[in-house]
């Protein structure tokens, strides 16, 4: 699955232009296929995540940044 990975507060993982950080989060930590910093949203975005990986969803948003 694809989506925005979350931190332990349920918030999207913030980034500015650091694709390497997002790639590490998505591929190494969450076992996805690829990751990058989605510039317009300023958040990491992952592709090819396993079903167990939690991704941000507007309907279930619990982020209290």
UniProtKB/Swiss-Prot annotation:
One GO cellular component, as annotated: extracellular region
Keyword terms of this UniProt record: Disulfide bond, Ion channel impairing toxin, Neurotoxin, Secreted, Toxin, Voltage-gated sodium channel impairing toxin
Family: Belongs to the long (4 C-C) scorpion toxin superfamily. Sodium channel inhibitor family. Beta subfamily.
Domain of life: Eukaryota
Annotated InterPro entries: LCN-type_CS_alpha_beta_dom, Scorpion_toxin-like, Scorpion_toxin-like_sf, Scorpion_toxinL, Scorpion_toxinL/defensin
Function according to Swiss-Prot or TrEMBL: Beta toxins bind voltage-independently at site-4 of sodium channels (Nav) and shift the voltage of activation toward more negative potentials thereby affecting sodium channel activation and promoting spontaneous and repetitive firing.
PROSITE patterns in UniProt: LCN_CSAB (PS51863)
A Pfam family that the UniProt record links to this protein: Toxin_3
Gene Ontology biological-process entries: defense response
UniProt xrefs under CDD domains: neurotoxins_LC_scorpion
Protein name, as recorded: Toxin Cbi1
Key word Disulfide bond present: yes
Keyword NAD included in the entry's annotation: no
């Amino acid at each position: 699955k694809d989506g925005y990975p979350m931190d332990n507060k349920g918030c999207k993982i913030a980034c500015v232009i650091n694709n390497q950080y997002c790639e590490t989060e998505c591929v190494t930590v969450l076992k996805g296929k690829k990751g990058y910093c989605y510039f317009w949203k300023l958040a990491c975005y992952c592709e090819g995540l396993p079903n167990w990986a939690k991704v941000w969803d507007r309907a279930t948003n619990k982020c209290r940044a």
